[in-house]
């Protein structure tokens, strides 16, 4: 699974996921299913945000050009992917500026058009079950919830899906592709079933020995985005930086 994640996702997303797991004392090499889930969630958050801007009249528009008009403002502020301290700093700043109620839990995005925080969910289970779990945890009508599944289903607060159909279809297609690629490598069942995942983990740990096999070649170059994470979310260059992550996973 770890090899799959490093092949399938944009290196920047992989680095952010590793950083997030280490912040909570988790090891991406051991908790590989969680590693894959975090990368998937990060990518969906970025795809949700990408190409969406607000023009000078306050209208939401979609711009896929790499160099949008300077008067355009990103519609979504990405909170997911930052370290906790910076994430709360961004949330506090938004609340102070917009007078929106501060959430109890860190949300994933802020929508400047609808003036609301958004919680994004990606589930391997039934969307309505995961939606209820999220709503139960958040306990706030102010935070908008949008759940996607790997089967193309989705569910959102008051059936308000925020994005246009084409943007949502792009996300669903990517999730379906990830599922298909996992299945083709025999990884999907363990990704869905915790019991199967534990069995696979024991098997993997048993087979791991020092110097066993050749290590996978991975680029360890630090992404410029990680050095300047804060301004990156505000700059239009993020579209180009993340576009590669929308591509189909390479076959082995």
UniProtKB/Swiss-Prot annotation:
This is Protein PA-X. One of its GO terms (molecular function) is RNA binding. It comes from Influenza A virus (strain A/Duck/Germany/1949 H10N7). Belongs to the influenza viruses PA-X family. The record marks 195, 198-199 as: Important for efficient shutoff activity and nuclear localization. The record marks 202-203, 206 as: Important for efficient shutoff activity. Residues 202-223 are annotated as: Disordered. The probable endonuclease active site in the N-terminus and the basic amino acid cluster in the C-terminus are important for the shutoff activity. The C-terminus acts as a nuclear localization signal. The C-terminus is recruited to host protein complexes involved in nuclear Pol II RNA processing. The gene is PA. Keywords: Decay of host mRNAs by virus, Eukaryotic host gene expression shutoff by virus, Host cytoplasm, Host gene expression shutoff by virus, Host mRNA suppression by virus, Host nucleus, Host-virus interaction. The active site is at 80, 108. It is found in: Host cytoplasm; Host nucleus. InterPro entries: PA/PA-X, PA/PA-X_sf. Plays a major role in the shutoff of the host protein expression by cleaving mRNAs probably via an endonuclease activity. This host shutoff allows the virus to escape from the host antiviral response. Hijacks host RNA splicing machinery to selectively target host RNAs containing introns for destruction. This may explain the preferential degradation of RNAs that have undergone co- or post-transcriptional processing. The lineage of its organism: Viruses, Riboviria, Orthornavirae, Negarnaviricota, Polyploviricotina.
